[in-house]
A protein has these predicted regions:
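AMP-dependent adenylate-forming
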Residues: 1, 20, 131-132, 147-248
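Conserved adenylation A10 loop of the ANL superfamily
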Residues: 1-12
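Conserved AMP-binding/adenylation subdomain of ANL enzymes
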Residues: 11-40, 48-88, 146
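Short, well-ordered beta-strand segments
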Residues: 14, 38-40, 46, 52, ...
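Alpha-helix/helix-capping structural signal
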Residues: 18, 95, 117-118, 189-190
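His-Asp-centered acyl/peptidyl-transfer active-site segments
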Residues: 34-36, 41, 51, 83, ...
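Conserved AMP-binding
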Residues: 43-47, 70, 137, 188
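Gly/Ser/Thr-rich phosphate-binding loop
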Residues: 59-63, 85-91, 97-156, 165
Length: 249
């Protein structure tokens, strides 16, 4: 799956079956996916979140509903489609999902997740749970999630998924205490193999995990995101090391 990553130049990210499997195990547990669930395939097929829509549903026995192109940005049409088809779970890019959550009630929906860019503070919807998700393609879709249950002046990205560990380090690779800002490092079963035909770039941002040699956690990915741990264990993104701006995920 191709991603611009930290350079702005598209790179082929080599995701493995094990990466997706680890994510789908977490997806089932966190969202309560079962045979009664109906998942909306809303994300673009060029966006890694489409793998969540597709594999998260079909590996757990849920129905998958591909959203018609003509209603993707029609909130009234989308709400009608969700309720007529009993859609229980949906993902949208951050600003689209935020606007939907602010404007639309939806009795069938249980979870609306958003991701791809920083979430502007807002009040959560009353009918369904609103999830702020974070994760680079290199670590398979989501790395953290946070339930927005009230108005937060600066919305955290949450805590690590089941098969992921996170560190925040300084420029020398030393782990930092809560409150201190540094680069967010990601390790675990969701970290991908590296970049297709780019061994030098792979070696630069996929390095040996100096803090944990547990099987599945031997490699850590340098996200390029500056973050800090909050006192409650949630993570807050501060910015980018390279000042990169994300547009439409």
């Amino acid at each position: 799956l191709y991603t611009s990553g930290s350079t702005g130049v598209p790179k082929g990210c080599m995701l493995e079956y094990g990466n997706i499997t680890a994510f789908c195990h977490w997806f089932k547990r966190y969202y309560g996916i079962d045979s009664d669930s109906r998942v909306a395939a809303y994300a673009s097929f060029g966006f890694d979140a489409c793998m969540m829509d597709i594999y998260g549903a079909i590996t757990n026995g849920a129905q998958l509903h591909i959203i018609p192109e003509e209603i993707r940005l029609d909130f009234i049409g989308l709400q009608r489609y969700f309720e007529e088809n009993g859609i229980t779970h949906s993902f949208m890019t951050t600003q689209v999902g935020r606007q939907f959550a602010l404007e639309m009630d939806c009795k069938s929906l249980r979870y609306l997740s958003v991701g791809g860019e920083k979430l502007v503070p807002c009040e959560p919807p009353k009918d369904y749970k609103f999830i702020n998700a974070y994760g680079p393609t290199e670590a398979t879709i989501f790395t953290t999630v946070f339930e927005v249950d009230k108005y937060y002046p600066n919305v955290p990205i949450g805590k690590a998924l089941d098969n992921v560990k996170l560190y925040i380090t300084d420029k020398l690779g030393h782990m930092l205490p809560p409150g201190a800002c540094g680069e967010l490092m990601i390790t675990g079963w969701q970290v991908s193999r590296g970049y297709l035909n780019k061994p030098e770039k792979t070696a630069e941002v996929y390095t040996k995990n100096l803090y944990d040699d547990t099987p599945g956690y031997e490699v850590m990915y340098h996200s390029g995101d500056v973050a800090r741990f909050l006192p409650d264990g949630n993570i807050q993104i501060i910015g980018r090391k390279d000042s990169q701006v994300k547009i439409r995920g």
